[in-house]
Protein backbone atom coordinates (compact mmCIF):
# COMPACT_ATOMS: atom_id res chain seq x y z
CA UNK A 1 0.00 0.00 0.00
CA UNK A 2 2.81 2.37 0.89
CA UNK A 3 4.66 1.82 -2.39
CA UNK A 4 1.49 2.49 -4.42
CA UNK A 5 1.09 5.90 -2.74
CA UNK A 6 4.80 6.65 -3.30
CA UNK A 7 4.54 5.67 -6.95
CA UNK A 8 1.46 7.87 -7.37
CA UNK A 9 3.24 10.86 -5.79
CA UNK A 10 6.29 10.30 -7.97
CA UNK A 11 4.11 10.12 -11.10
CA UNK A 12 2.22 13.30 -10.15
CA UNK A 13 5.48 15.17 -9.48
CA UNK A 14 6.92 14.02 -12.80
CA UNK A 15 3.81 15.04 -14.75
CA UNK A 16 3.66 18.40 -12.93
CA UNK A 17 7.30 19.10 -13.70
CA UNK A 18 6.83 18.18 -17.36
CA UNK A 19 3.80 20.48 -17.67
CA UNK A 20 5.65 23.30 -15.92
CA UNK A 21 8.66 22.98 -18.24
CA UNK A 22 6.50 22.86 -21.37
CA UNK A 23 4.46 25.84 -20.24
CA UNK A 24 7.55 27.98 -19.69
CA UNK A 25 9.39 26.89 -22.83
CA UNK A 26 8.67 30.11 -24.73
CA UNK A 27 10.00 32.39 -21.98
CA UNK A 28 13.46 33.90 -22.11
CA UNK A 29 15.32 35.12 -19.05
CA UNK A 30 17.60 38.08 -18.35
CA UNK A 31 17.88 41.43 -20.12
CA UNK A 32 18.28 39.72 -23.49
CA UNK A 33 14.62 38.77 -23.25
CA UNK A 34 13.67 42.44 -23.62
CA UNK A 35 14.89 42.60 -27.20
CA UNK A 36 14.11 40.63 -30.38
CA UNK A 37 16.56 37.68 -30.53
CA UNK A 38 17.00 37.73 -34.32
CA UNK A 39 18.49 41.26 -34.35
CA UNK A 40 22.20 41.69 -33.55
CA UNK A 41 23.23 44.88 -35.37
CA UNK A 42 21.57 48.25 -35.91
CA UNK A 43 22.40 50.91 -38.49
CA UNK A 44 21.51 54.43 -37.34
CA UNK A 45 21.83 56.95 -40.17
CA UNK A 46 21.97 60.66 -39.34
CA UNK A 47 18.53 61.84 -38.24
CA UNK A 48 16.91 64.27 -40.64
CA UNK A 49 15.76 67.59 -39.25
CA UNK A 50 13.03 70.07 -40.10
CA UNK A 51 14.38 72.31 -37.33
CA UNK A 52 16.39 75.41 -38.08
CA UNK A 53 18.62 74.93 -35.05
CA UNK A 54 22.14 73.86 -35.95
CA UNK A 55 23.57 70.46 -34.96
CA UNK A 56 20.35 69.27 -33.33
CA UNK A 57 20.05 66.18 -35.53
CA UNK A 58 23.74 65.32 -35.07
CA UNK A 59 23.42 65.57 -31.30
CA UNK A 60 20.26 63.44 -31.23
CA UNK A 61 21.83 60.78 -33.49
CA UNK A 62 24.91 60.64 -31.26
CA UNK A 63 22.76 60.34 -28.11
CA UNK A 64 20.68 57.52 -29.64
CA UNK A 65 23.80 55.60 -30.70
CA UNK A 66 25.30 55.93 -27.21
CA UNK A 67 22.04 54.85 -25.59
CA UNK A 68 21.76 51.78 -27.86
CA UNK A 69 25.33 50.74 -27.09
CA UNK A 70 24.80 51.31 -23.37
CA UNK A 71 21.40 49.72 -22.75
CA UNK A 72 20.84 47.09 -25.44
CA UNK A 73 22.66 43.96 -26.61
CA UNK A 74 22.87 45.41 -30.13
CA UNK A 75 25.99 46.59 -31.88
CA UNK A 76 25.66 49.83 -33.84
CA UNK A 77 27.34 49.45 -37.22
CA UNK A 78 28.08 51.96 -39.95
CA UNK A 79 26.88 49.91 -42.86
CA UNK A 80 23.35 49.83 -44.26
CA UNK A 81 23.33 46.01 -44.57
CA UNK A 82 22.86 45.57 -40.81
CA UNK A 83 20.10 43.40 -39.33
CA UNK A 84 17.97 46.50 -38.75
CA UNK A 85 17.83 50.22 -39.52
CA UNK A 86 16.63 52.88 -37.07
CA UNK A 87 15.73 56.10 -38.88
CA UNK A 88 14.40 59.32 -37.47
CA UNK A 89 13.41 62.86 -38.29
CA UNK A 90 13.19 65.86 -35.98
CA UNK A 91 9.85 67.46 -36.77
CA UNK A 92 9.98 70.46 -34.49
CA UNK A 93 11.72 72.03 -31.55
CA UNK A 94 9.87 74.43 -29.32
CA UNK A 95 11.23 76.86 -26.75
CA UNK A 96 8.73 78.46 -24.45
CA UNK A 97 8.93 80.59 -21.36
CA UNK A 98 7.47 78.82 -18.34
CA UNK A 99 8.20 81.36 -15.59
CA UNK A 100 8.73 85.14 -15.81
CA UNK A 101 9.50 87.67 -13.13
CA UNK A 102 7.42 90.86 -12.70
CA UNK A 103 9.74 92.63 -15.18
CA UNK A 104 9.10 90.06 -17.97
CA UNK A 105 12.54 88.52 -17.59
CA UNK A 106 12.72 84.80 -18.38
CA UNK A 107 13.30 82.71 -15.27
CA UNK A 108 12.59 79.25 -16.64
CA UNK A 109 12.44 77.98 -20.21
CA UNK A 110 11.11 74.69 -21.50
CA UNK A 111 12.63 73.13 -24.61
CA UNK A 112 10.65 70.39 -26.36
CA UNK A 113 11.90 68.33 -29.28
CA UNK A 114 9.42 66.34 -31.35
CA UNK A 115 10.64 63.55 -33.61
CA UNK A 116 9.36 60.53 -35.48
CA UNK A 117 11.26 57.26 -35.62
CA UNK A 118 10.98 54.01 -37.51
CA UNK A 119 12.80 50.73 -36.84
CA UNK A 120 12.73 48.21 -39.67
CA UNK A 121 14.52 44.94 -40.33
CA UNK A 122 16.53 44.05 -43.42
CA UNK A 123 13.37 43.15 -45.37
CA UNK A 124 11.72 46.47 -44.51
CA UNK A 125 9.26 45.02 -41.98
CA UNK A 126 8.46 47.06 -38.89
CA UNK A 127 10.18 45.78 -35.74
CA UNK A 128 8.89 46.20 -32.23
CA UNK A 129 5.35 47.30 -32.99
CA UNK A 130 3.34 47.40 -29.79
CA UNK A 131 0.64 44.76 -29.76
CA UNK A 132 -1.71 46.65 -27.43
CA UNK A 133 -1.15 50.11 -28.87
CA UNK A 134 -2.66 50.62 -32.33
CA UNK A 135 -0.01 52.30 -34.47
CA UNK A 136 -1.32 52.80 -38.00
CA UNK A 137 2.01 53.63 -39.60
CA UNK A 138 5.62 52.54 -39.29
CA UNK A 139 6.45 55.92 -37.76
CA UNK A 140 6.16 56.66 -34.06
CA UNK A 141 6.15 60.25 -32.80
CA UNK A 142 7.96 61.04 -29.57
CA UNK A 143 8.85 64.15 -27.65
CA UNK A 144 11.55 64.96 -25.15
CA UNK A 145 11.48 67.96 -22.85
CA UNK A 146 14.25 69.79 -21.05
CA UNK A 147 14.25 72.76 -18.69
CA UNK A 148 16.72 75.64 -18.57
CA UNK A 149 16.89 78.03 -15.62
CA UNK A 150 19.17 80.97 -16.51
CA UNK A 151 19.50 82.05 -12.86
CA UNK A 152 21.29 78.78 -12.12
CA UNK A 153 23.70 79.25 -15.01
CA UNK A 154 21.83 76.98 -17.40
CA UNK A 155 21.67 77.95 -21.05
CA UNK A 156 19.30 76.94 -23.81
CA UNK A 157 21.94 74.40 -24.88
CA UNK A 158 21.65 72.78 -21.45
CA UNK A 159 17.89 72.42 -21.84
CA UNK A 160 18.32 71.12 -25.39
CA UNK A 161 20.78 68.48 -24.22
CA UNK A 162 18.39 67.41 -21.49
CA UNK A 163 15.58 67.10 -24.07
CA UNK A 164 17.89 65.17 -26.44
CA UNK A 165 18.91 62.73 -23.69
CA UNK A 166 15.28 62.10 -22.73
CA UNK A 167 14.35 61.64 -26.39
CA UNK A 168 17.18 59.11 -26.87
CA UNK A 169 15.98 57.14 -23.83
CA UNK A 170 12.44 57.02 -25.24
CA UNK A 171 13.66 55.92 -28.68
CA UNK A 172 15.74 53.09 -27.24
CA UNK A 173 12.88 52.01 -24.96
CA UNK A 174 10.78 51.52 -28.11
CA UNK A 175 13.27 48.85 -29.17
CA UNK A 176 12.22 46.62 -26.26
CA UNK A 177 9.90 43.72 -27.01
CA UNK A 178 6.44 44.28 -25.51
CA UNK A 179 5.31 41.79 -22.88
Spans of model-derived segments:
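Bacterial N-terminal signal peptides that target proteins for export
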Residues: 1-13
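Membrane-targeting and insertion segments and their boundary/processing signals
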Residues: 10, 30-38, 58, 89, ...
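Bacterial N-terminal signal peptides
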Residues: 11-23
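Residues embedded in well-ordered secondary-structure elements
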Residues: 13, 33, 77, 104-106
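N-terminal start-of-chain detector that recognizes signal peptides
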Residues: 18, 47-48, 56-63, 84-92, ...
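A structural "domain/chain start" motif
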Residues: 22-66, 70-81, 125, 164, ...
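Second-shell loop/turn segments in exported
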Residues: 48-54, 150-160
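Surface-exposed short loop/turn segments
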Residues: 70-74, 85-155, 165
Amino acid sequence: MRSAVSNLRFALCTVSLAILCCGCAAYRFGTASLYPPDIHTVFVPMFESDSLRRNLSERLTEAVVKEIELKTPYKVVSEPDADSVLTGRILNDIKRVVVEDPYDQQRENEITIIAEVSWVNRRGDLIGSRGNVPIPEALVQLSGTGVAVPEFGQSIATGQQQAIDRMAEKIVSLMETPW
